[in-house]
Amino acid sequence: HVAHFVIDGGIRSAARTEPADKPDSMLDPDAIALSYWNVLQQPRSAWTWELELRPWVEKF
């Protein structure tokens, strides 16, 4: 199984935090890891090969 992940946003870290006036404006590394794990564990009857991860506040 091959999967393609698009990480479209900054990743929160101890050295790089989000502004106080923009909560949830950066991706949480633990949430990214959980998304990878979920793809690994997905059932074969509902298969994906691409997943895009963006912060909640991003406008389309």
Language-model features, listed with the residues they occupy:
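C-terminal helical subdomain
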Residues: V2-R12, P19-F60
